Amino acid sequence: MAHEELGDRAVAVTVRSSTFPRRELDEAVAFCRSEGIRHEVIDTSELDIPGFAENPPDRCYLCKKSIFGRIIAFAQTNGFAAVLEGSNLDDDGDYRPGMRAIRELGVRSPLHDAGLTKAEIRALSREMGLPTAEKPSFACLASRFPYGERITAAGLERVERAEQWLRDSGLGLAQLRVRSHGDLARIEVPAGDIARVAARADEVAAAFKRFGFAYAALDLQGYRTGSLNETLAADKRK
């Protein structure tokens, strides 16, 4: 919509980082190219942010503060008056320390401010004919590690490879997460897909061992957003 109103006076910005799968960047580049949207890619290194690799409960705050600081600097250097991001009303329902950084930096959240939920955004996207209307929700790869478990480049790569293998396995998984608990990979898929993954347990386990996991487990509760926040004490969510 910004592109329709402003043309090249609006620019889409994507970060390139070890915490985001390469396929996410490729999809962003392809989408902007197909829509004729001006697009910039900024290289970031979240593992160099002080405190990030230790994976504290406010890791997302540290990350958002750094990344959006870079984007704001880009905007100021190139004459853009505002920076927008895509949070929606549903994001209020989970622990989101990154939202504090967004507010502190003065970044605007127009979809959230308009009171739009994820389902409503998908419906509007369908009306506009956007290919992203059915795109599964996604969070950065750092969100696959329990708080307090150190995040490393090797660990991020291991998770990315495991998730990509599941997507390419022919299991027809539209949504999934591989949570890294030390040497154990905990696989989350929607409840309706659990039996299908379990039927190929030996193949999945063998693949995950190739990626460096000693064990592969299937979460019987199924996929849910922010599952690693479930054990976070209430006082840590503030």
What are the roles of these predicted feature ranges?
Residues G226-K238:
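Short, low-order "capping/linker" segments at domain edges
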Residues T117-A123, L130-A139, G172-A174:
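Short, structured loop/turn "capping" segments at alpha-beta junctions
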Residues V11, S180-A191:
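Short, aliphatic-rich beta-strand segments
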Residues D193-E203:
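Short, conserved charged micro-motifs
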Residues A154-A174, D202:
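Short amphipathic alpha-helix segments
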Residues G172-R177, Y215-A217:
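A short linear hydrophobic-aromatic micro-motif
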Residues K135-A153:
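Internal, active-site/partner-interface "lid" segment
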Residues M1-E127, A185, E203-F213, L218, ...:
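ATP-dependent adenylation/nucleotidyltransferase module used to activate substrates
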